[in-house]
UniProtKB/Swiss-Prot annotation:
Keyword list, A-Z: Cell membrane, Disulfide bond, G-protein coupled receptor, Glycoprotein, Membrane, Olfaction, Receptor, Sensory transduction, Transducer, Transmembrane, Transmembrane helix
Location relative to the cell: Cell membrane
Disulfide cysteine pairs (residue numbers): 98-190
Protein name, entry field: Olfactory receptor 10H28
Gene that encodes it: Or10h28
Keyword Transmembrane carried by entry: yes
């Protein structure tokens, strides 16, 4: 990192919940704490159920395990710090800690998006090219897809962190967000390169997300076309049910992201902006294990079976 950044600003203030009345914060803290704990527990239960149920040792559930890991790490990077700030009057974060939070949040966030693409591709191959499924979705092939997803997320996280923290911050050190968010940091930057860097950051942030969304949409166009060719209603329903949980998570993932990043800034108060930012950082990870466990019959049965097995072992 260049020395000028350290000489101008050595720490940032996360404004986040500072504007909220103190009476509201304990209730919000309890709500977000419960959602955070449920997110961790839900994803761990999913991973444990897949690990113990040999019938679920398939590519689709391997990708789901990788997705659960990315969600746990994404949540751990953001939520504990947010909860700590809600009950503290000292909401400063050091320059290095801010850079680390930016890197890891974007790494795990983009890894999550890439894994959703991989899961969509898995469903496309299973439904549209079933005869080639085992060849295309071998253990080595699945491992490569997961590795590429993590590598892609890490590359984007590293690129954004390097770009942002090579800027000069000299206007203010107050970040109007609950975390070190890239666009909130750009507002604090000054210098001749800021406008150019802003355009570059937008391209780096938006292009992969649009690419992922387009790939998922194309996958489902082919999937729906293949399902409509199935003669029986029961067959169509059974085939589509294998995609329902993934499609729902994609809609939630991109739906909340669109609401946050495409909304008009002038229409919302600081309270609303802060609460809306938590929909993507807290609420979306909270919903994901619920959707997968409720809308996936095999996984739901595996979780129930694992629960009964543990209860029986403890009662003996």
């Amino acid at each position: 990192m260049p020395g000028q950044n350290y000489s101008t600003i050595s720490e940032f203030i996360l404004f986040g919940f500072s504007a909220f009345p103190h009476q509201m914060l304990p209730a919000l803290f309890l709500l977000y704490l419960l959602m955070y704990l449920f997110t961790l527990l839900g994803n761990l239960v999913i991973m444990a159920a897949i690990w113990t149920e040999h019938r679920l040792h398939t590519p689709m559930y391997l990708f789901l395990c990788a997705l659960s890991i990315s969600e746990i790490l994404f949540t751990v990077v953001i939520t504990p710090r947010m909860l700590s700030d809600m009950l503290s009057t000292h909401r400063s974060i050091t320059f290095i800690a801010c850079a680390n939070q930016l890197f890891f949040s974007f790494t795990f966030g983009y890894t999550h998006s890439f894994l959703l693409v991989v899961m969509g591709y898995d469903r496309y191959v299973a439904i549209c090219r079933p005869l080639h499924y085992h060849a295309l979705m071998s253990l080595q092939g699945c491992a490569r897809l997961v590795a590429w997803s993590w590598a892609g997320g890490s590359l984007i996280g590293m690129a954004l962190t390097i770009i942002i923290f090579h800027l000069t911050f000299c206007e203010s050190n107050v970040i109007h967000h609950i975390l070190c968010h890239v666009f909130s940091l750009l507002k604090l930057a000054c210098g001749e390169r800021t406008a150019f860097v802003t355009i570059a950051v937008i391209l780096v942030c938006v292009t992969p997300l649009i690419g992922c969304l387009v790939f998922i949409i194309l996958s489902y166009i082919f999937i729906v076309a293949a399902i409509l060719r199935i003669p029986s209603t029961e067959g169509r329903h059974k085939t589509f049910s294998t995609c329902a949980s993934h499609l729902t998570v994609v809609i939630v993932h991109y739906g909340f992201a669109s609401i946050i990043y495409l909304k008009s800034r002038g229409l919302y108060s600081q309270y609303t902006d802060t609460l809306m930012s938590t929909t993507y950082t807290v609420f979306t990870p909270f919903l994901s294990p619920i959707i997968f466990s409720l809308r996936n019959k095999e996984l739901k049965n595996a979780i129930i079976k694992s629960f009964h097995r543990n209860v029986c072992q403890q009662s003996i």
